[in-house]
């Protein structure tokens, strides 16, 4: 007998099955089997639901099974041959079949080399078996299809599928098991007289329908449940099959929807399918639409909702179901977020092998042995090294730039007798030996056995202590054994095979079951969820994620599948049908809860990509006109981790009334890790000043020393939070060897200083040296600087290549400096001259609120020229990067260094004399300029002139004729400059030339800026307010973006007006901007060190 139970979602179809099962077992605890067949993902939960029923008598009759587990039980009853190869063996065998028959393929020959083609082909073959497609069906279809391209593709697929089945036809994949079930079921005692309940399905594949047909012929009674909202012809097919078999059919309709305790949820269930649903006018206490800034905030809101429901509404955690998109971010992070809120959660996803240490070890062992491979091995935690040794060795490898052959050469290490080398030998001796023999391996058996032996020698099984690790180890060793058994003495390319094996392991996952009973359940909306939930929370309701778009057809396009269907070759549903299925999944998600539904969507991704709410959101607003998107928070925070996360983000939001503090997300976490004692003070500061963004006076003890550098002050004006993280928290990136600008700069600065010093001490001039002498001088200075600053560059080929480039850059720069020296009366006074406490140059002292702060730094080069009792000063600062400077940047505080150095030098009258004239401050850029096509046809001298134009000094000069003509003698004769970037006009104007009054006004402004920065730093003002000057911002190239993570719409910029130099000077012409007001506010003062 066949009973078809039909009814809408929530009408109690599953409850009917369970009640009937209990009724049957109560009537007869002994007898034929009672089988409850449900989707694979629901077997555990349904078994638990039935076995925890107090009214269920003990019985051996009941089994809760999936279709494949049912088939397995029947096949085992006959002790039939059973073998199930791994997915990897299927893929690799299919790859070998493709390689051997590639020349016979017409259409798929080129596609065979595409990444993922093997996986797609294997999925297609599994689809064939589910839909009972045999090679002869493909051959028949190819003769009936008129389209030549499809005809040839069918012939290609026919050939490969035929060979695949010859290899694996007898193996029991899940599809193969069902086929074997059809063979053994009619003779099965296990099924004889059984009562079967098939529940939780809304459609069946042809193979599953054939299984049901066999059950009808074999078992006493079969009951199938079907939803009325979605029926792709299944009811009629079951009905007609039963009638054809002469089996009585009973239809039971459950029309009353009993699930919902909230009227709005009942309205939702009854009105989902019409495009224009009836509007609901009642209260909306149990239906919520939530908008979040991003997926992370969305998950946190969900966690707070769950805490609220558990604390105030009496929900058990198992009463709550969270449905999430099946893309990586939600699946990967929801457990971490919920755990921070003290919520145990079962996430319906497999255990990913590539998250375990064993994978990292294999990745290091099987790939090319280099620094990255070594670090992967260290990350595994499976080497014979302590945690301290692993940490120290990883940092050593990264900071020293050791790579390639240098890793295994003892003499290449900085100190071969140190503990680093001992740790290296202890941890990597066996791995290095294996990496040397790996390319020599010839067969699959050798590969498998050698890899097993290595892992045993390292002691991997002893160090895997976690339950998941043991499962991964067992799965991997089983795979190696299978490879050895299946492929044995066949020859292989070990490098290619290792890459293929790693690619497979990266996608491998193991099934999980819930470890606890009272925990939140989370997973994809397309999964079958057993039983009713009191509350459902849907996350990620945006287009393209909820529901996820249907996958494109594999190998065959949608158009080709439609043509195949016309000639009788039925495969999985076309996209139109799959879209209907997806819509039904959305409906199931919405109607799973009996009391509350929360639908949530993020506005943007964590990378700033905008999202469009899903069609579901629009439908809900039509069905419930009073439903509004809620932006607020939910519940109270009770865990320290959650509170820290919440505080850090709430501080970056700016309320419309401007009351909320503005500080970057992640600052508190950084504080907690670096200086726990700061947390209390920060909390107290914000608690006592909720409307401000200042840390209280107690923070002065944690401020850096009262000696400040100009570059630090520029950092503060770039973004106060950046200053806070870099200099107070001292949050640093791990040291990794790369030719950074700081190291390049140190090497070049050191070499130039050595050259200028050598020439000055010998009483010579660069401009008078012969070309060979200049070359020798540059080589000697570069070699010396390389020993002091460039040792790391020698560690790698890339580093040595950079050294060669730097040498050429230095030589061209010295040639340019020598050339420029012939046009100026200024001569070097000193190189790398420091100012500050006990330094050659006295430092400015700034008094702020009774505290003294000293400026310190180092000037790359000071040149002087003496004439008529006056001493003219010129500052040169060497740069390896951009050398642009404008006065709006100076008064904005982000480019203070050059003119501040001139200010410091010009106030050291004890050293240079009373009649001191600041003649100018300039950048000189190290570079390797290239000439364009305009240079064709120029003489050698003209080419040199073109090259030297690129090296001209860039900055500001004093607008004083006496000073200018000695600064560049070419100007005195030609009224234009050759060595500096000053541009002259016929009316006497000179760009970048400042009158003494203008220069003095700039100096006053700079003093005010330094004073104000000191005041704000000492007052604890570290808000996340980066500067913005036209398109440039303080966030550009910032190392702390991952800590800050301010959303673009949340940023509050300190806008520096874009002004030309004359406009800035005009604004300063009144004697500075706001200096008197500043002094009044900060009680500031200024003087030179005494």
From Swiss-Prot:
Q: Pfam families from the xrefs?
A: ADDB_N, PDDEXK_1
Q: Does the keyword 4Fe-4S apply?
A: yes
Additional notes on this entry: Despite having conserved helicase domains, this subunit does not have helicase activity.
Assembly mode: Heterodimer of AddA and AddB.
What are the entry keywords?
4Fe-4S, ATP-binding, DNA damage, DNA repair, DNA-binding, Exonuclease, Helicase, Hydrolase, Iron, Iron-sulfur, Metal-binding, Nuclease, Nucleotide-binding
Q: Which residues bind ATP?
A: 7-14
Family label: Belongs to the helicase family. AddB/RexB type 1 subfamily.
Entry's InterPro entries?
Answer: ADDB_N, P-loop_NTPase, PDDEXK-like_dom_sf, PDDEXK_AddAB-type
What Enzyme Commission number(s) appear in the record?
A: 3.1.-.-
Q: Which SUPFAM superfamilies match?
A: P-loop containing nucleoside triphosphate hydrolases
Q: Which gene encodes it?
A: addB
Report the domain of life of the source organism.
Bacteria
- One GO molecular function term? DNA binding
**Binding-site residues for [4Fe-4S] cluster, renumbered to this chain:** 719, 1035, 1038, 1044
Record GO biological process = DNA recombination; DNA repair
Cofactor(s) needed, names only, are: Mg(2+); [4Fe-4S] cluster
Keyword Ion transport on entry: no
> Main role?
The heterodimer acts as both an ATP-dependent DNA helicase and an ATP-dependent, dual-direction single-stranded exonuclease. Recognizes the chi site generating a DNA molecule suitable for the initiation of homologous recombination. The AddB subunit has 5' -> 3' nuclease activity but not helicase activity.
Instruction: Report the co-factor binding details.
Output: Binds 1 [4Fe-4S] cluster.
Indicate what this protein is called per its UniProt record.
ATP-dependent helicase/deoxyribonuclease subunit B
């Amino acid at each position: 007998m066949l009973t078809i139970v039909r009814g809408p979602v929530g009408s109690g179809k599953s409850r009917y099955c369970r009640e009937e099962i209990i009724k049957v077992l109560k009537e007869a605890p002994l007898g034929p089997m009672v089988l409850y067949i449900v989707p694979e993902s629901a077997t555990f939960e349904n078994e638990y639901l039935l076995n925890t029923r107090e009214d269920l008598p003990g019985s051996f009759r009941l089994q809760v099974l999936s279709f494949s587990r049912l088939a397995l039980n029947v096949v085992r009853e006959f002790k039939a041959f059973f073998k199930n190869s791994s997915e990897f063996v299927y893929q690799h065998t299919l790859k070998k079949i493709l390689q051997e028959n590639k020349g016979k393929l017409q259409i798929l020959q080129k596609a065979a080399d595409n990444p993922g083609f093997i996986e797609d082909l294997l999925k297609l073959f599994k689809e064939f078996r589910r839909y009972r497609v045999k090679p002869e069906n493909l051959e028949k279809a190819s003769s009936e299809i008129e389209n030549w391209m499809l005809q040839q593709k069918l012939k290609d697929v026919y050939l490969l599928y035929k060979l695949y089945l010859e290899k694996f036809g007898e193996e029991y994949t899940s599809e193969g098991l069902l086929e074997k079930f059809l063979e053994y079921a009619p003779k099965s005692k296990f099924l004889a007289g059984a009562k079967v309940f098939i529940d939780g399905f809304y459609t069946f594949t042809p193979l599953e329908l054939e299984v049901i047909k066999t059950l009808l012929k074999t078992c006493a009674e079969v009951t199938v449940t079907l939803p009325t909202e979605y029926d792709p012809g299944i009811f009629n097919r079951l009905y007609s099959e039963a009638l054809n078999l002469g089996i009585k059919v009973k239809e039971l309709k459950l029309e009353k929807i009993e699930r919902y305790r909230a009227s709005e949820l009942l309205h939702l269930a009854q009105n989902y399918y019409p495009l224009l649903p009836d509007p609901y006018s009642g209260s909306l206490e149990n239906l919520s639409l939530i908008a979040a800034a991003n997926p992370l905030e969305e998950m946190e809101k969900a966690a707070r909702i769950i805490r609220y429901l558990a604390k105030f509404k009496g929900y058990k955690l198992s009463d709550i179901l969270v449905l999430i998109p099946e893309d990586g971010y939600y699946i990967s992070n929801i457990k971490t977020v919920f755990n921070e809120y003290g919520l145990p959660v079962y996430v319906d996803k497999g255990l990913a092998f590539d998250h375990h240490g064993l994978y990292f070890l294999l990745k290091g062992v099987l790939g090319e042995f280099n620094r990255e491979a070594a670090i992967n091995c260290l990350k595994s935690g499976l080497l014979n090294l302590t945690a301290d040794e692993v940490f120290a060795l990883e940092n050593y490898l990264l900071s020293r730039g050791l790579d390639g052959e240098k890793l295994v050469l003892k003499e290449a290490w900085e100190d071969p007798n140190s503990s680093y080398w001992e740790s290296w030998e202890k941890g990597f001796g066996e791995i290095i030996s294996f990496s040397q023999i790996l390319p020599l391996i010839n067969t699959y058996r050798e590969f498998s056995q050698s890899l097993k032996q290595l892992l045993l020698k390292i002691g991997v099984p002893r160090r895997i202590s976690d339950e998941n690790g043991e499962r991964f180890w067992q799965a991997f060793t089983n795979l190696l054994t299978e490879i050895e058994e299946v492929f044995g003495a066949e020859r292989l390319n070990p490098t290619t095979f290792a890459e293929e094996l790693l690619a497979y392991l990266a996608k491998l996952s193991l099934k999980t079951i819930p470890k606890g009973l009272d925990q939140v359940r989370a997973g994809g909306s397309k999964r079958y969820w057993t039983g009713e939930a009191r509350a459902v929370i849907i996350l990620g309701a945006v287009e393209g994620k909820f529901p996820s778009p249907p996958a494109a057809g594999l190998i065959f396009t949608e158009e080709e599948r439609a043509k195949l269907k016309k000639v009788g070759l039925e495969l999985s549903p076309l996209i139109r049908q799959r879209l209907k299925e997806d819509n039904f999944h959305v409906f199931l998600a919405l109607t799973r809860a009996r009391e509350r539904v929360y639908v949530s969507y993020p506005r943007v991704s964590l990378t700033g990509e905008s999202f469009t709410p899903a069609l579901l959101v629009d439908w809900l607003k039509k069905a419930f006109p009073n439903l509004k998107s809620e932006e607020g928070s939910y519940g109270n925070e009770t865990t320290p981790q959650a509170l820290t996360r919440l505080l850090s983000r709430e501080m970056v939001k700016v309320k419309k009334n401007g009351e909320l503090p503005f500080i970057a997300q992640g600052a508190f976490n950084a504080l907690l890790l670096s200086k726990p004692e700061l947390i209390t003070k920060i909390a107290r500061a914000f608690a006592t000043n909720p409307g401000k963004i200042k840390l209280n006076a107690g923070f002065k003890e944690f401020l850096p020393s009262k000696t400040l550098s100009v570059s630090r002050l520029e950092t503060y004006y770039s973004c106060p939070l950046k200053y806070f993280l870099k200099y107070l928290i001292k949050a640093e990136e791990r040291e990794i060897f790369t030719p950074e600008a700081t190291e390049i700069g140190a090497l070049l600065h050191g070499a130039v200083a050595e050259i200028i010093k050598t020439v000055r001490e010998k009483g010579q001039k660069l401009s008078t040296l012969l070309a060979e002498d200049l070359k020798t001088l540059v080589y000697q200075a570069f070699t010396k600087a390389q020993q002091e600053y460039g040792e790391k560059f020698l560690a790698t080929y890339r580093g040595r290549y950079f050294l060669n480039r730097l040498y050429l850059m230095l030589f061209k720069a010295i040639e340019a400096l020598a050339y420029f020296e012939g046009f100026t009366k200024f001569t070097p006074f000193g190189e790398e001259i420091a100012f500050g406490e006990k330094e050659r140059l006295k430092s400015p002292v700034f008094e702020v609120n009774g505290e003294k702060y000293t400026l310190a730094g180092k000037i790359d080069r000071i040149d002087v020229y003496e004439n008529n009792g006056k001493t003219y000063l010129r500052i040169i600062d060497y740069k390896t990067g951009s050398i642009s400077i404008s006065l709006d940047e100076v008064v904005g505080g982000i480019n203070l260094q050059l003119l501040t150095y001139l200010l410091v030098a010009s106030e050291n009258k004890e050293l240079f004399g009373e009649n001191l004239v600041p003649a100018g401050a300039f950048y000189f850029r190290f570079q390797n300029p290239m000439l364009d096509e305009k240079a064709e046809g120029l003489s050698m001298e003209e080419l040199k002139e073109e090259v030297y134009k690129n090296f001209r000094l860039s900055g500001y000069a004093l607008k004083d004729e006496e000073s200018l003509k000695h600064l560049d003698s070419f100007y005195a004769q030609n009224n234009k400059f050759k060595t500096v970037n000053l541009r002259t006009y016929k009316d006497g104007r000179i760009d970048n030339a400042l009158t003494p009054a203008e220069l003095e006004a700039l100096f006053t402004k700079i003093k005010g800026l330094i004073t104000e920065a000191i005041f704000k730093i000492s007052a604890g003002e570290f808000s996340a307010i980066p500067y913005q000057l036209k398109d440039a911002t303080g966030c550009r190239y910032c190392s702390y973006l991952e800590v800050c993570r301010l959303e673009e719409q949340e940023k509050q910029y300190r806008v520096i007006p874009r002004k030309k130099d004359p406009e800035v000077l005009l604004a300063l012409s009144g004697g500075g901007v706001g200096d008197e007001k500043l002094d009044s506010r900060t009680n500031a003062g200024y003087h030179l060190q005494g």
